[in-house]
């Protein structure tokens, strides 16, 4: 066959990526070269992180056989990371689930039984019985769902409707609680609206990049490649990287800073002090667009109320704040001197000053990037607020090339978990369940009785674990997440509840994960391009894809599972009589009729799909389900600064960044000339706040929930590696990625290893107050912790590092701190 220059370049890109990771050229590259004419290509966003790279998916004979970077995608411009090039192989692991599995003994369900294949009708029969029994005996608070930032937009929306409107339970929360909740609360406190004001286009215009607790080189490698290009092509560009240990992003750093865990709060306040002391405040911006408030302190650690740390806290969980003057704020940050900061953080003074100068220099455009180092933090909301302070003091915000930017880790943590409102306290478009007006808006749009949606906030992720253990949450459905491996404190707070005979656990997943194997019922799930989908990435870019192949066996999408299960419930079985009396026409209808087969959702015919276009759910139901759900959902944000484009526009584009007004996307929010919601002459308007002003918060340093002592003498930090994504349930089934990083290791400083008579390659027992795991000593490699700290990734199901972690959370966001707990080591 003829091989075009473009095909040759694509194949070489794959080969180069494989070579960079020390791998042989995969079949993906060979497919591009050898079968170009036989492969059908279509676009999709990548299945992995929140960057939102565009890929071209190659299908042949009903299978995904190839994948390449989409040269027309503005995010990645044709480049993929090593995981992206192996996307086809995540779908075809040898142990892919193809039929429902129920624990059974002697032909019926048994908590201690063996997993046995059953039909979907049988699976729904058991689920129906468990849900109806719990609802009848204990009410809506006895059921719950744990969802995902990997749900498609309409899957998250359908789940939220089913639980909040159908079952009248706000006990639905996404795994984004573990990664982005602190960012959400930080945005809401400072700006009154969620999500970043900038976009990836800032990279090519910035003068300085500051990474706070973010290893972009491995976790957001495509964005890092753009930063690297910017840094290496302009000698005046500066990169600063802050972390508790050295990692691959330090290789590009002009100023690489290692600080004592938790002391990032000190550094942030020091920089604010430096800006004020050096008269570097942008007075015009500051005087017009900023308010000052002092936040409540000593707010606890989100542990059980009986925990000594919670009992000792003066203001546990308090989000309170009060106005303060500039002079009071100036005096507050003045305590964070250079000398004090250097002492508390362990960072040399010259490095601190260099960092502060970047923010203070009025001629430098600065972008602050952060991910889990800030968010998975018992003061994660504060850390978010404090970095916003720096940009608000200097006016370096909402303009090309400068601004604070919270990066996301999952493909639709923004588009689904946050924007749709699948958190236990949220509704679509930044609305919340505690606000009567917001509930009323949803109830009217959904045509359900007033008072249907509960006003009480539901159980967040960690609270769900505790309620399961305590026997208060009895039916629990998890989708598109592996929380038994990814969540904190497995031994004490999660496993007991999952295996409690009072509780029934359902896991929907493509593979037999740690979570699935701990459940009672496993539902086989369609993944990625086996369904039509939509994700929203970190820069507010919403991206669609078509179903391109069918799922194996009886595997069904999460959307299908939710919608079909809703047929099992009539309104009389889930709503009290006083609600039905308000809308008697809904009596006798199923939740499917009320929530999904409504005139609003079902008005788009299947004929809108091309004749040969796959869409299993819509063709089965007889209407274009995804379009109906999306257009209903999009209504909530239009006209309110969350405007999404019409459904069909997304299938034509490589994503659009909201707000999309009059067909035009928005790159920079809150600034005149960029944001359609900011009028001429306003300059800047932070319209999430009633007065249009953002808030600078005065917030102090407070210590971690658990720190090393004489017995448990090391800090433990957990995280990811380039080759694997989250718990590895997809990437470890790709042979090439598995070979590249086959098992987790314990990264440790050579002197700490030597002091414990440990050598590289030794087996070592890592012990905390909550559990222990066996790992392998690594004194070299990509991650280089300082003395006193060890680092361990969580992708390895054979080394469940979250047996060790503490379920301490930020009291405001309820997000777990996976970066700081105390451990000791024992040689095996």
Swiss-Prot record:
Chain positions recorded as substrate binding sites: 794
Question: Mind telling me what this protein is named?
Answer: Periplasmic nitrate reductase
Subunit field text: Component of the periplasmic nitrate reductase NapAB complex composed of NapA and NapB.
* EC class name: oxidoreductase
- Assigned protein family: Belongs to the prokaryotic molybdopterin-containing oxidoreductase family. NasA/NapA/NarB subfamily.
Q: Which cofactor does it need?
A: [4Fe-4S] cluster; Mo-bis(molybdopterin guanine dinucleotide)
- Gene name, per UniProt, is napA
Where does it reside?
Answer: Periplasm
